[in-house]
Amino acid sequence: MIQDNSATKGSDATHQMSQSEYALVQNLTVLYGEGGASYLAKRMMAIAMGELMARPEEHADPKPLSAADRMLICYGDSVRDEPGMPLSALRQFATQYLQNSISTIHILPFFPSSSDDGFAVIDYQTVRRDLGDWSDINALSADFDLMFDLVINHCSRENLWFADFVGGREPGCDYFHEMPSMVGLESVVRPRNSPLLTHVHTYQGIKRVWTTFSDDQIDLNFANPEVLCEFVHILFSYIAQGARFIRLDAIAFLWKELSTSSINLEQTHCVVRVLRALIDEMQTRTLLLTETNLPHNENVSYFGSRDEAHLVYQFSLAPLILYSYLFNDGQYLGQWAEQLEPPPAGCSFVNFIASHDGIGLRPLEGLVPASDIQRLTDAAHERGGFAAMRSADDGTETVYELNIALFSAFGGTAKNIPAYLGAHQLMLAFQGIPALYLNAFVGGLNDLQGVESTGRTRSINRGHWQLDDLKTILATETNEQSIIFAELNRSLEIRGSQSAFAPSAQQEILAYTKDSLWLKRENTDQVILVIASFSEAPIETELPRQDAEYESVIDLLSEDAVVLTKAVPMAPYQVRWLSIAKT
């Protein structure tokens, strides 16, 4: 405990603060000054406690991360079953097919929204009526852990806060960034090529507001502590509804400062530390995940000193794996993986190859030459995909993500299945928690009709499935989608019971060449040697360091006995998980 000697007016009482409360006050002091920091801290703790007391049973039972943690990413209406509600259909699908392979479902924003498939939130506290209601969310949480998005950087222009801004009313009149001009904004880092400032007609005339992502997504002003208090309320209402994981969407852009890049500012890290300190103080089981699709060093900075995010995405992994399999060359992946620092104790990575967004290319900066990044872009175009652009610092436009369904990126035919499965099985072996996007899990292809109907290139990978159609597809053993789903499901089941795949288990790159990579995962109970082939032809590869205890082992995936004292045969694109029990 830490003694707080700052007495309230008229009192000489001292207050014994916990470590987390002390961190809360210190970070609020950085953000808003010393005068009101203690008051703000107490107010935020009261807000959090008030939400948690409403449903005390939903935020108990903390549990450590393990190999059994495996995530599914999907929309609330990814699976449909008219006339029933999509969230009910999702539960039917998940309970029938995923009980042994998936532990957590990340339901992408399921709140009323005006654009961007949920990421322009109108009402943070309500479930979209066309999806279901909170009882459907609670029903899912009975069978799976859940992840919710906290869309914290911006809200919809249809949000009541922005209606207040337009009307000059409290509280929202001071919740947004009103900018007189572009002066001082020349260095702002842009994730898009849309205008940074949007002109809005208000009762007081035309105003310019900050819009990082689109003119429908208005950035919130966290220099106003009332805005942060609003999001403390929202965060803990989600925790009270049973969220085990909270994803902080677009968090890197949160704090704005004139004449700076307005990305990854220290104040943004302070806000994350405030949320983390509150979670620690309330002793909830909830873990924070930051979404920062940036170069690796910037991304992992959100671990802080074990006082910010519990989890960060390993964004570089997805495009590096894609490059390795498309061009039969794993050297960039090996170079990057070899120099990876392990996450701090108590923290972990989240790994994926595909998500609802495109395949980000900014995480390749400094890892892959521009000419080879262009090769990836060209390959996506050749396979029916799109390249999304952002405005660079010099005013030019540059590709920031590839919009394409993952199986289409691999070629989208039966002959591409071995590479597609191998890529996933390698991703599953990397240190961290694996996350599979539903459309990739079932081998979905480019949804060009979706692009045409919405006018947005990201819709190419955001298709929906009718539950009965999906069941029919998965029951037909000879089609590509059924083969992919069955093998990925089996791989996830196997992974879940291997202690060496726990997020805390050590990782070491033993060797890599253009054709192959050797990866070692180890904890006190088990060693798993992972071999991945990037070759379209059969190859043989040898264990880099001979060890007597590794002479004969079992491949968990193929169930073959493998002798490691001689070259190991590998089929095209094969991945092996060689298990060695410790005695």
Predicted regions and their residues:
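Active-site and adjacent substrate-binding regions of carbohydrate-active enzymes
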Residues: 2-545, 558-583
